[in-house]
Amino acid sequence: MYKRQVYVWLDALTNYITGIGYDAEGNSSEQYKKLWPADLHLIGKDIIRFHTIYWPIFLMALNEPLPKQVFGHPWLLQGDGKMSKSKGNVLYADDLVDFFGVDAVRYFVLHEMPFENDGVISWELMVERLNSDLANTLGNLVNRTISMSNKYFGGVVADKGAAEAVDEDLKAVVTGTYDKVAAKMEGWRVADAITDIFTLFKRCNKYIDETEPWVLAKDPAKADRLATCLLYTSDAA
C-alpha cells in the first residue's frame, strides 16, 4: 500500500507547465516564460470541467497566470454514435493519413467539426468531401488559372486593361470574404470560415465561366482584356 497518493488530474494538468520548464522555486525556464500563459487552451468538450475549474484553482494556488482562453471542441462521431472498439467502428488516424495524406485529413477534420455540434466521419464521407472540395472546387480553380496563364502569357500575367463590372464584383467578394473569415477565426469558428473560403472559390470558378478567357484568347484585339481576367482570377485564387 502506498503511503502517498496524487490525484490523477493534478498530475496530468501540471504537465502543461512542467513540460515547458515551470519551477516552483522561481527558476522557470525561458521557454516557460515565453509560452505561458497559453493564448488558447484547446481541449475536448468531455474534460471541460477539469480545465475550467480544477486547473485554474491549481494555477491560482501557485500564483501563476491562467490560460487566456479555453475552447472545448466537439467530437467526431462514426455514424450515429461514438466510436468504440467493441462496436468495431473505430477509425485510426494513422490509417487515414496513410491513405489520404495528412493535409487532407486535417482539412476534413476542420471542415466537419462544427462550432456547436459534433461532426461525423467515415471513409465514404472523406472521399466525398475531398473530391468535392479539394479536387473539384479548389483543384479545378487552380488548374484552370495556372493552365491558361501559362498557355496565353507564359505564366506571367500583367494588368493591361481597365476593370469591368464583373471584375469589381469579384474583388468585392474577395474583400468581403477576408473580413468574414477573419472574424470567424477570431471566434474559433473554423468550419464556418472554411465554408466562406470555398464559397469564394466557387465564385472564382463562376467568374472564369462568365469572362470566358478561352474565347478572348482567340481575338488578338482582346489580349488586354484576357490579361485582366486572368490577373483577377490569379489574385482571387
Where are these regions (language model features)?
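Conserved small/polar residues in nucleotide/adenosyl-binding loops
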Residues: M1-Q5, Y232-A237
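Short acidic-hydrophobic sequence patches enriched in Asp/Glu that either
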Residues: G88-Y92, V166, V173
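Helix-rich, typically C-terminal accessory recognition domains appended to large enzymatic cores
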Residues: E112, L125-A163, L170-S234
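Structured secondary-structure scaffolds
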Residues: K3-K151, A193-I197
